Amino acid sequence: MSQIAQEMTVSLRNARTQLDMVNQQLAYLDRQEKLAELTKKELESYPTDKVWRSCGKSFILQDKSKYVNDLSHDETVLLDQRKTLKIKKNYLETTVEKTIDNLKALMKN
């Protein structure tokens, strides 16, 4: 009986660790989405057709429309990643809840 409880405790600890990592990744995606959105808004307010884009330690001259399209694509990728992470988060939350319930039931017996 104690072997099962130990295994469940390890499983619970692992699920909580993974859940924390998923929450951190979701927070990072939030920041990236906001950055892309704000950059896109800022670029759309510029009257010029060409803008300088950061590329590592240097800059390249690029069409504003191309840069805005790249940012829109990045936002789409971020939304897909967010969807996947939310599914994983839901799974991990369910796993944590069920493991806790099972541990409680095991301790009652």
Swiss-Prot record:
GO terms for cellular component: cytoplasm; prefoldin complex. It comes from the Eukaryota. Keywords: Acetylation, Chaperone, Cytoplasm. This is Prefoldin subunit 1. Belongs to the prefoldin subunit beta family. GO terms for molecular function: protein folding chaperone; unfolded protein binding. The gene is PFD1. The keyword Cytoplasm applies. Heterohexamer of two PFD-alpha type and four PFD-beta type subunits. Binds specifically to cytosolic chaperonin (c-CPN) and transfers target proteins to it. Binds to nascent polypeptide chain and promotes folding in an environment in which there are many competing pathways for nonnative proteins.
